[in-house]
Amino acid sequence: PLMNDNFGGLAVGGTRITDPRLVFGGAGPVPLEAVIGPVTVSTDIALNNPTGPFNNLGIPGAKSFHLIAPGYGNLSNFPAAANPYAVRVTGNAPNASIVELAVAQIPTFFTLSEIGGNDVLGYATSGGDGSNLITDTATFDFALNTMVGAMVSTGAKGAIANLPNITSLSYFTTVPHNPVPLDAGTAAFLNSASAYGAYNAGIVQAFAFLVANTPMTQEMADAEIAKRTITFAEGEGNAVVIFDESLTDLTQINPALVSMRQATAADLVVLTAASFIGTEAIPGNAQTVNGVAIPLADKWVLTPEEQEEIATATTSYNASISAVASANGLALVDLNSVLVEASTTGINFDDYNLNTDLVFGGLVSLDGVHLTARGYALMANEFLKAIDATFGSNFEASGNMAKAADYPVTFSPLLP
Protein backbone atom coordinates (compact mmCIF):
# COMPACT_ATOMS: atom_id res chain seq x y z
CA PRO A 1 0.00 0.00 0.00
CA LEU A 2 1.00 3.60 -0.52
CA MET A 3 3.61 4.72 1.99
CA ASN A 4 4.46 8.31 2.79
CA ASP A 5 8.16 7.79 2.05
CA ASN A 6 10.69 5.15 1.06
CA PHE A 7 11.88 4.51 4.61
CA GLY A 8 8.93 2.22 5.18
CA GLY A 9 7.50 1.18 8.50
CA LEU A 10 4.15 1.95 10.08
CA ALA A 11 3.00 3.83 13.16
CA VAL A 12 -0.23 4.28 15.10
CA GLY A 13 -0.60 7.67 16.71
CA GLY A 14 3.17 8.15 16.65
CA THR A 15 3.99 4.70 18.07
CA ARG A 16 5.95 2.50 15.68
CA ILE A 17 4.33 -0.87 14.93
CA THR A 18 6.53 -2.07 12.05
CA ASP A 19 10.13 -1.19 11.33
CA PRO A 20 11.57 0.54 8.25
CA ARG A 21 12.59 -1.51 5.24
CA LEU A 22 15.60 -3.76 4.79
CA VAL A 23 18.58 -2.76 2.65
CA PHE A 24 21.57 -4.61 1.26
CA GLY A 25 24.42 -4.37 3.76
CA GLY A 26 27.22 -5.78 1.62
CA ALA A 27 26.73 -9.44 2.47
CA GLY A 28 23.03 -9.71 3.11
CA PRO A 29 19.92 -7.86 4.28
CA VAL A 30 20.21 -5.45 7.20
CA PRO A 31 17.75 -2.97 8.73
CA LEU A 32 17.78 0.45 7.09
CA GLU A 33 18.58 2.16 10.39
CA ALA A 34 21.72 0.04 10.79
CA VAL A 35 23.07 1.84 7.72
CA ILE A 36 21.78 5.40 7.87
CA GLY A 37 20.84 5.75 11.53
CA PRO A 38 17.44 6.47 13.11
CA VAL A 39 14.58 7.58 10.87
CA THR A 40 11.09 8.81 11.61
CA VAL A 41 8.32 6.48 10.51
CA SER A 42 5.90 8.93 8.94
CA THR A 43 3.23 6.56 7.66
CA ASP A 44 0.69 6.61 10.48
CA ILE A 45 -2.51 4.60 10.11
CA ALA A 46 -4.24 6.77 12.71
CA LEU A 47 -3.25 10.11 11.20
CA ASN A 48 -2.57 10.17 7.47
CA ASN A 49 -4.29 7.44 5.49
CA PRO A 50 -5.13 8.25 1.86
CA THR A 51 -8.79 8.03 0.90
CA GLY A 52 -8.67 5.94 -2.27
CA PRO A 53 -10.24 4.19 -4.04
CA PHE A 54 -7.34 1.93 -4.98
CA ASN A 55 -6.97 -0.39 -7.94
CA ASN A 56 -4.32 -2.39 -6.06
CA LEU A 57 -5.95 -3.93 -3.02
CA GLY A 58 -3.25 -6.45 -2.21
CA ILE A 59 -2.87 -6.64 1.58
CA PRO A 60 0.37 -8.04 3.04
CA GLY A 61 -0.35 -10.82 5.50
CA ALA A 62 -4.01 -11.23 4.56
CA LYS A 63 -5.31 -14.78 4.45
CA SER A 64 -8.10 -15.77 2.08
CA PHE A 65 -10.89 -15.36 4.63
CA HIS A 66 -9.58 -11.97 5.73
CA LEU A 67 -10.34 -10.56 2.28
CA ILE A 68 -14.07 -11.17 2.71
CA ALA A 69 -14.21 -10.07 6.37
CA PRO A 70 -15.99 -6.77 7.16
CA GLY A 71 -13.93 -4.45 9.34
CA TYR A 72 -10.57 -5.97 8.44
CA GLY A 73 -9.46 -2.44 7.61
CA ASN A 74 -11.18 -0.66 10.49
CA LEU A 75 -8.66 0.99 12.81
CA SER A 76 -10.93 0.42 15.80
CA ASN A 77 -10.46 -3.33 15.29
CA PHE A 78 -6.66 -3.09 15.36
CA PRO A 79 -4.71 -5.06 16.42
CA ALA A 80 -7.12 -7.87 17.34
CA ALA A 81 -9.01 -8.17 14.06
CA ALA A 82 -7.63 -5.62 11.61
CA ASN A 83 -4.56 -5.43 9.40
CA PRO A 84 -2.69 -2.10 9.39
CA TYR A 85 -2.15 -2.33 5.63
CA ALA A 86 -5.88 -2.86 5.16
CA VAL A 87 -6.52 0.22 7.30
CA ARG A 88 -4.48 2.18 4.75
CA VAL A 89 -6.84 1.38 1.89
CA THR A 90 -10.37 1.33 3.31
CA GLY A 91 -10.70 5.12 3.16
CA ASN A 92 -14.21 6.32 3.98
CA ALA A 93 -15.61 2.78 4.22
CA PRO A 94 -13.69 1.28 7.15
CA ASN A 95 -16.12 -1.60 7.64
CA ALA A 96 -16.11 -2.69 4.00
CA SER A 97 -14.34 -5.93 3.19
CA ILE A 98 -11.47 -5.81 0.74
CA VAL A 99 -13.61 -7.57 -1.87
CA GLU A 100 -16.41 -5.06 -1.34
CA LEU A 101 -13.95 -2.22 -1.98
CA ALA A 102 -13.03 -3.86 -5.28
CA VAL A 103 -16.60 -4.57 -6.39
CA ALA A 104 -17.68 -1.01 -5.55
CA GLN A 105 -15.40 0.23 -8.33
CA ILE A 106 -17.42 -1.82 -10.88
CA PRO A 107 -14.34 -3.20 -12.63
CA THR A 108 -14.47 -4.71 -16.10
CA PHE A 109 -11.37 -6.81 -15.40
CA PHE A 110 -9.67 -8.04 -12.24
CA THR A 111 -6.68 -10.12 -11.18
CA LEU A 112 -6.36 -12.32 -8.11
CA SER A 113 -2.78 -13.17 -7.23
CA GLU A 114 -1.48 -15.42 -4.45
CA ILE A 115 -4.89 -15.90 -2.86
CA GLY A 116 -4.10 -18.56 -0.29
CA GLY A 117 -0.40 -17.77 -0.11
CA ASN A 118 -0.65 -16.30 3.37
CA ASP A 119 -2.87 -19.18 4.45
CA VAL A 120 0.24 -21.37 4.44
CA LEU A 121 2.96 -18.72 4.72
CA GLY A 122 2.28 -17.81 8.33
CA TYR A 123 2.59 -21.45 9.33
CA ALA A 124 5.80 -21.81 7.34
CA THR A 125 7.57 -18.67 8.56
CA SER A 126 6.77 -19.61 12.17
CA GLY A 127 8.45 -22.96 11.65
CA GLY A 128 5.16 -24.81 11.93
CA ASP A 129 5.12 -24.23 15.67
CA GLY A 130 1.33 -24.03 15.83
CA SER A 131 1.08 -20.29 16.49
CA ASN A 132 -0.20 -19.60 12.95
CA LEU A 133 -2.16 -22.52 11.59
CA ILE A 134 -2.75 -23.49 7.97
CA THR A 135 -6.24 -22.56 6.79
CA ASP A 136 -8.39 -25.65 6.31
CA THR A 137 -9.49 -26.38 2.75
CA ALA A 138 -13.20 -25.82 3.41
CA THR A 139 -12.58 -22.31 4.76
CA PHE A 140 -10.26 -21.50 1.87
CA ASP A 141 -12.75 -22.78 -0.70
CA PHE A 142 -15.57 -20.72 0.81
CA ALA A 143 -13.46 -17.56 0.79
CA LEU A 144 -12.20 -18.16 -2.74
CA ASN A 145 -15.65 -18.81 -4.19
CA THR A 146 -17.09 -15.83 -2.33
CA MET A 147 -14.40 -13.55 -3.76
CA VAL A 148 -14.66 -14.76 -7.31
CA GLY A 149 -18.45 -14.78 -7.19
CA ALA A 150 -18.48 -11.17 -6.06
CA MET A 151 -15.98 -10.07 -8.71
CA VAL A 152 -17.78 -11.71 -11.65
CA SER A 153 -21.22 -10.59 -10.45
CA THR A 154 -20.85 -7.33 -12.36
CA GLY A 155 -19.88 -9.11 -15.57
CA ALA A 156 -16.16 -8.56 -15.12
CA LYS A 157 -13.61 -10.89 -16.66
CA GLY A 158 -10.45 -11.79 -14.81
CA ALA A 159 -7.28 -13.76 -14.23
CA ILE A 160 -6.27 -15.78 -11.20
CA ALA A 161 -2.91 -17.27 -10.25
CA ASN A 162 -2.21 -20.54 -8.53
CA LEU A 163 0.23 -20.84 -5.64
CA PRO A 164 3.91 -21.74 -5.72
CA ASN A 165 5.53 -24.06 -3.22
CA ILE A 166 6.63 -21.37 -0.79
CA THR A 167 9.31 -23.52 0.79
CA SER A 168 11.36 -22.95 -2.38
CA LEU A 169 11.75 -19.30 -1.40
CA SER A 170 15.03 -18.06 0.02
CA TYR A 171 13.47 -17.53 3.45
CA PHE A 172 13.64 -21.30 3.79
CA THR A 173 16.71 -22.18 1.73
CA THR A 174 19.39 -19.66 2.74
CA VAL A 175 20.45 -20.81 6.22
CA PRO A 176 22.20 -24.21 6.09
CA HIS A 177 21.34 -26.98 8.51
CA ASN A 178 25.03 -27.33 9.44
CA PRO A 179 26.53 -23.86 10.04
CA VAL A 180 28.37 -24.62 13.30
CA PRO A 181 32.21 -24.46 13.45
CA LEU A 182 33.86 -26.09 16.46
CA ASP A 183 37.36 -26.48 17.82
CA ALA A 184 38.54 -29.88 19.02
CA GLY A 185 38.02 -29.14 22.70
CA THR A 186 34.45 -27.94 22.32
CA ALA A 187 33.52 -30.88 20.09
CA ALA A 188 35.00 -33.32 22.60
CA PHE A 189 33.07 -31.75 25.46
CA LEU A 190 29.78 -31.83 23.55
CA ASN A 191 30.29 -35.52 22.82
CA SER A 192 31.18 -36.36 26.42
CA ALA A 193 29.00 -37.81 29.16
CA SER A 194 28.80 -34.29 30.60
CA ALA A 195 26.83 -33.19 27.54
CA TYR A 196 25.22 -35.12 24.67
CA GLY A 197 27.03 -38.36 25.45
CA ALA A 198 24.61 -38.91 28.31
CA TYR A 199 21.64 -38.24 26.05
CA ASN A 200 22.91 -40.68 23.43
CA ALA A 201 23.36 -43.42 26.01
CA GLY A 202 19.95 -42.66 27.48
CA ILE A 203 18.05 -43.05 24.23
CA VAL A 204 19.66 -46.45 23.62
CA GLN A 205 18.45 -47.60 27.04
CA ALA A 206 14.99 -46.11 26.52
CA PHE A 207 14.46 -47.80 23.18
CA ALA A 208 15.69 -51.11 24.59
CA PHE A 209 12.92 -50.78 27.17
CA LEU A 210 10.34 -50.01 24.45
CA VAL A 211 11.41 -52.96 22.31
CA ALA A 212 11.10 -55.26 25.32
CA ASN A 213 7.76 -53.95 26.53
CA THR A 214 5.83 -52.53 23.55
CA PRO A 215 5.09 -53.47 19.92
CA MET A 216 8.11 -51.41 18.78
CA THR A 217 10.55 -53.53 16.77
CA GLN A 218 14.32 -53.39 17.02
CA GLU A 219 14.44 -52.12 13.45
CA MET A 220 12.17 -49.21 14.34
CA ALA A 221 14.21 -48.49 17.45
CA ASP A 222 17.52 -48.55 15.58
CA ALA A 223 16.18 -46.12 12.98
CA GLU A 224 15.14 -43.58 15.59
CA ILE A 225 18.29 -44.04 17.65
CA ALA A 226 20.32 -43.20 14.55
CA LYS A 227 18.11 -40.18 13.90
CA ARG A 228 18.41 -38.88 17.47
CA THR A 229 22.09 -39.55 18.17
CA ILE A 230 23.88 -36.21 18.50
CA THR A 231 27.58 -35.96 17.64
CA PHE A 232 29.96 -33.14 16.85
CA ALA A 233 33.37 -32.96 15.18
CA GLU A 234 36.22 -30.48 14.99
CA GLY A 235 35.89 -28.05 12.09
CA GLU A 236 33.11 -26.60 9.95
CA GLY A 237 29.82 -28.19 9.02
CA ASN A 238 28.33 -29.30 12.32
CA ALA A 239 24.54 -29.53 12.25
CA VAL A 240 22.43 -27.56 14.68
CA VAL A 241 20.41 -29.36 17.35
CA ILE A 242 16.65 -28.96 17.07
CA PHE A 243 13.50 -29.97 18.90
CA ASP A 244 11.28 -32.28 16.83
CA GLU A 245 7.82 -33.15 18.15
CA SER A 246 7.49 -35.97 15.60
CA LEU A 247 10.00 -38.06 17.55
CA THR A 248 8.87 -40.70 20.03
CA ASP A 249 8.19 -39.14 23.43
CA LEU A 250 10.68 -40.72 25.83
CA THR A 251 10.23 -38.31 28.74
CA GLN A 252 7.97 -40.71 30.66
CA ILE A 253 10.87 -43.15 30.69
CA ASN A 254 13.48 -40.48 31.43
CA PRO A 255 12.54 -36.78 31.71
CA ALA A 256 15.96 -35.79 30.33
CA LEU A 257 15.30 -37.52 27.02
CA VAL A 258 13.47 -34.68 25.30
CA SER A 259 12.54 -34.96 21.62
CA MET A 260 15.63 -33.49 20.02
CA ARG A 261 18.01 -34.39 17.22
CA GLN A 262 20.48 -32.78 14.87
CA ALA A 263 19.11 -31.17 11.73
CA THR A 264 19.63 -32.75 8.33
CA ALA A 265 19.56 -31.40 4.79
CA ALA A 266 15.87 -32.32 4.70
CA ASP A 267 15.10 -29.70 7.37
CA LEU A 268 14.57 -26.06 6.40
CA VAL A 269 16.03 -23.51 8.80
CA VAL A 270 14.20 -20.18 8.51
CA LEU A 271 16.05 -17.03 7.50
CA THR A 272 15.60 -15.26 10.83
CA ALA A 273 17.48 -18.07 12.57
CA ALA A 274 20.69 -16.78 10.98
CA SER A 275 20.98 -14.08 13.66
CA PHE A 276 19.94 -16.44 16.47
CA ILE A 277 22.08 -19.53 15.95
CA GLY A 278 25.30 -19.18 17.94
CA THR A 279 23.98 -16.57 20.36
CA GLU A 280 24.08 -17.31 24.08
CA ALA A 281 20.86 -17.82 26.00
CA ILE A 282 22.76 -16.57 29.04
CA PRO A 283 25.17 -13.88 27.85
CA GLY A 284 28.74 -14.77 28.71
CA ASN A 285 27.95 -18.44 29.29
CA ALA A 286 29.45 -20.48 26.45
CA GLN A 287 27.50 -23.54 27.59
CA THR A 288 24.20 -21.92 26.57
CA VAL A 289 24.83 -21.48 22.84
CA ASN A 290 21.57 -21.61 20.91
CA GLY A 291 21.48 -24.34 18.31
CA VAL A 292 24.36 -26.21 19.97
CA ALA A 293 24.00 -26.53 23.73
CA ILE A 294 20.36 -25.46 23.56
CA PRO A 295 18.22 -26.98 20.78
CA LEU A 296 16.46 -24.67 18.37
CA ALA A 297 12.76 -24.33 19.13
CA ASP A 298 10.15 -25.40 16.61
CA LYS A 299 9.71 -21.87 15.26
CA TRP A 300 13.20 -21.86 13.76
CA VAL A 301 12.92 -25.01 11.63
CA LEU A 302 10.50 -26.66 9.22
CA THR A 303 10.82 -30.41 9.53
CA PRO A 304 9.92 -32.71 6.62
CA GLU A 305 6.59 -33.50 8.28
CA GLU A 306 5.73 -29.81 8.49
CA GLN A 307 6.84 -29.25 4.91
CA GLU A 308 4.48 -32.01 3.83
CA GLU A 309 1.58 -30.26 5.57
CA ILE A 310 2.36 -27.11 3.58
CA ALA A 311 2.66 -29.02 0.31
CA THR A 312 -0.62 -30.85 0.90
CA ALA A 313 -2.50 -27.61 1.59
CA THR A 314 -0.93 -25.88 -1.41
CA THR A 315 -1.91 -28.74 -3.71
CA SER A 316 -5.46 -28.62 -2.38
CA TYR A 317 -5.70 -24.85 -2.77
CA ASN A 318 -4.38 -25.05 -6.33
CA ALA A 319 -6.99 -27.64 -7.25
CA SER A 320 -9.67 -25.27 -5.99
CA ILE A 321 -8.15 -22.32 -7.84
CA SER A 322 -8.05 -24.30 -11.09
CA ALA A 323 -11.67 -25.36 -10.64
CA VAL A 324 -12.93 -21.85 -9.92
CA ALA A 325 -10.99 -20.46 -12.89
CA SER A 326 -12.56 -23.03 -15.19
CA ALA A 327 -16.06 -22.52 -13.80
CA ASN A 328 -15.90 -18.75 -14.23
CA GLY A 329 -13.95 -18.43 -17.47
CA LEU A 330 -10.92 -16.86 -15.81
CA ALA A 331 -7.38 -16.92 -17.16
CA LEU A 332 -5.29 -19.26 -15.01
CA VAL A 333 -1.73 -18.13 -14.33
CA ASP A 334 0.67 -20.92 -13.41
CA LEU A 335 2.97 -19.19 -10.92
CA ASN A 336 3.74 -22.56 -9.38
CA SER A 337 5.67 -23.64 -12.48
CA VAL A 338 7.48 -20.31 -12.60
CA LEU A 339 8.86 -20.71 -9.09
CA VAL A 340 9.81 -24.34 -9.73
CA GLU A 341 11.89 -23.20 -12.70
CA ALA A 342 13.37 -20.25 -10.81
CA SER A 343 14.38 -22.42 -7.84
CA THR A 344 16.02 -25.11 -9.97
CA THR A 345 17.53 -23.88 -13.23
CA GLY A 346 16.73 -20.19 -12.89
CA ILE A 347 14.32 -18.43 -15.24
CA ASN A 348 15.33 -16.13 -18.07
CA PHE A 349 13.85 -12.64 -18.16
CA ASP A 350 15.27 -10.59 -21.02
CA ASP A 351 19.03 -10.39 -20.40
CA TYR A 352 18.79 -11.71 -16.84
CA ASN A 353 18.55 -15.15 -15.29
CA LEU A 354 16.56 -14.92 -12.08
CA ASN A 355 16.67 -17.51 -9.31
CA THR A 356 15.64 -17.76 -5.68
CA ASP A 357 19.04 -17.13 -4.08
CA LEU A 358 18.78 -14.41 -1.44
CA VAL A 359 19.98 -10.99 -2.67
CA PHE A 360 21.94 -12.18 -5.67
CA GLY A 361 19.25 -14.25 -7.40
CA GLY A 362 17.34 -11.15 -8.43
CA LEU A 363 13.88 -12.68 -7.98
CA VAL A 364 13.29 -12.60 -4.22
CA SER A 365 13.62 -9.47 -2.10
CA LEU A 366 15.65 -8.98 1.05
CA ASP A 367 12.96 -10.42 3.31
CA GLY A 368 13.34 -13.78 1.58
CA VAL A 369 9.61 -14.09 0.84
CA HIS A 370 8.29 -11.27 -1.31
CA LEU A 371 9.67 -10.57 -4.76
CA THR A 372 11.84 -7.77 -6.04
CA ALA A 373 10.41 -5.21 -8.44
CA ARG A 374 11.98 -7.25 -11.25
CA GLY A 375 10.46 -10.42 -9.86
CA TYR A 376 7.01 -8.89 -9.80
CA ALA A 377 7.50 -7.62 -13.35
CA LEU A 378 8.21 -11.20 -14.40
CA MET A 379 5.03 -12.38 -12.67
CA ALA A 380 3.04 -9.56 -14.30
CA ASN A 381 4.20 -10.81 -17.67
CA GLU A 382 2.92 -14.28 -16.79
CA PHE A 383 -0.48 -12.73 -16.15
CA LEU A 384 -0.37 -10.95 -19.51
CA LYS A 385 0.54 -14.17 -21.32
CA ALA A 386 -2.35 -16.01 -19.68
CA ILE A 387 -4.74 -13.16 -20.51
CA ASP A 388 -3.59 -13.28 -24.14
CA ALA A 389 -4.16 -17.03 -24.28
CA THR A 390 -7.61 -16.88 -22.68
CA PHE A 391 -9.13 -13.72 -24.09
CA GLY A 392 -7.29 -13.23 -27.39
CA SER A 393 -5.52 -10.01 -26.43
CA ASN A 394 -2.08 -9.19 -27.81
CA PHE A 395 0.07 -7.87 -24.98
CA GLU A 396 2.96 -10.13 -25.95
CA ALA A 397 2.64 -9.84 -29.74
CA SER A 398 2.47 -6.05 -29.57
CA GLY A 399 5.58 -5.78 -27.40
CA ASN A 400 3.72 -4.43 -24.39
CA MET A 401 5.35 -6.67 -21.80
CA ALA A 402 7.33 -5.44 -18.80
CA LYS A 403 11.07 -5.04 -19.46
CA ALA A 404 13.45 -6.46 -16.88
CA ALA A 405 15.88 -3.55 -17.10
CA ASP A 406 13.14 -1.12 -16.07
CA TYR A 407 12.80 -2.77 -12.67
CA PRO A 408 15.67 -2.80 -10.14
CA VAL A 409 16.31 -5.52 -7.60
CA THR A 410 17.61 -3.31 -4.78
CA PHE A 411 17.12 0.30 -3.75
CA SER A 412 19.65 2.67 -2.20
CA PRO A 413 19.43 3.21 1.56
CA LEU A 414 19.43 6.93 0.77
CA LEU A 415 16.25 6.77 -1.32
CA PRO A 416 14.07 9.50 0.26
Regions found by a protein language model. Give the residues of each.
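Conserved active-site regions of diverse hydrolases
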Residues: 1-416
